[in-house]
């Protein structure tokens, strides 16, 4: 009996940290394979073997800047490039009717609107964090907020490596959104850090605290404080592959799906 063909995945932003992790994960996947690895036209890695660049054996998939060709030949696209590239990715995916996983964090509201529009024509998975564990963190935070939110002081802690440019992280922003929606609060209830002489803490306040130091892959904690006890819900990423595994899982989920904007809750059935 012949083996089923593997899902062909085009990876955009393939030379970065996440790109290298996804190349590595795809090298051992039984369901999917890397069909193209796309980098910018100015990349010093153009023409290099993406497997060797990712610290694994040669895979024969060299870095290219031909986005359209990569999308055209793929079953699904994973994009971990930059904000500036998002419009080009969406345009190509719509043109060739290919689903896409968007792993770019810190999107503007206009870019999120663009995802909504594009999702009327193609399947899209967008999540600020592709980790299976982090999405469980999201769900547990929602549950805790329903049970303890109105009797607790709530704080979010976001720790990442010193190279990360956006703050708070997309994951911290998602945690904030979950809390606000669950508790019926607004952005006016959110405080980013604290300094100086302040008034006493408002009972509906949600604090967000950002650390950028060392080489931390990503730690997030949501705290629920009451006078009698404290709940801490923490996720710590120990290997960047956790995000890569989730991204590949999301791509496999999308193949054959009808157009729409999906999140990791849909992918994981949460």
From Swiss-Prot:
InterPro entries, per the entry: DapB_C, DapB_N, DapB_N_CS, DHDPR_bac, NAD(P)-bd_dom_sf
EC annotation from Swiss-Prot or TrEMBL: 1.17.1.8
Binding site for (S)-2,3,4,5-tetrahydrodipicolinate: 161, 170-171
GO MF term set: 4-hydroxy-tetrahydrodipicolinate reductase; NAD binding; NADP binding; oxidoreductase activity, acting on CH or CH2 groups, NAD or NADP as acceptor
Protein name per UniProt: 4-hydroxy-tetrahydrodipicolinate reductase
NCBIfam families assigned: dapB
Compartment list: Cytoplasm
């Amino acid at each position: 009996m012949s083996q089923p063909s593997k899902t062909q995945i085009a990876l955009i932003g393939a030379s970065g940290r996440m790109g290298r992790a996804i190349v590595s994960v795809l090298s051992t996947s039984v369901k999917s394979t890397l069909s193209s690895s796309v980098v910018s036209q100015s990349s010093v890695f153009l023409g290099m073997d993406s497997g060797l660049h990712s610290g694994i054996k040669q895979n024969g998939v060299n870095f290219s800047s031909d986005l359209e060709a990569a999308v055209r030949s793929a079953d699904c696209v994973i994009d971990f490039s930059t904000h500036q590239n998002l419009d080009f990715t969406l345009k190509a995916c719509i043109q060739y009717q290919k689903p896409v996983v968007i792993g770019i964090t810190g999107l503007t509201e206009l870019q999120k609107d663009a995802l909504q529009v594009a999702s009327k024509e193609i399947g899209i998975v967008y999540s600020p964090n592709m980790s299976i564990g982090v999405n469980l963190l999201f769900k547990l935070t929602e549950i805790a907020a329903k049970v303890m939110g109105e009797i607790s002081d709530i704080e979010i802690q976001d720790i990442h490596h010193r190279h990360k440019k956006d703050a708070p992280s997309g994951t911290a922003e998602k945690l904030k959104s979950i809390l606000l929606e669950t508790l019926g609060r607004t952005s006016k209830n959110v405080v980013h850090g604290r300094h100086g002489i302040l008034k006493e803490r408002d009972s509906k306040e949600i604090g967000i605290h950002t650390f950028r130091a060392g080489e931390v892959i990503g730690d997030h904690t949501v705290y629920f404080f009451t006078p009698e006890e404290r709940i801490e819900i923490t996720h710590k990423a120990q290997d960047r592959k956790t995000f890569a595994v989730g991204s590949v899982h999301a791509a496999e989920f999308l193949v054959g799906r009808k157009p729409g904007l999906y999140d990791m809750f849909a992918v994981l059935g949460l």
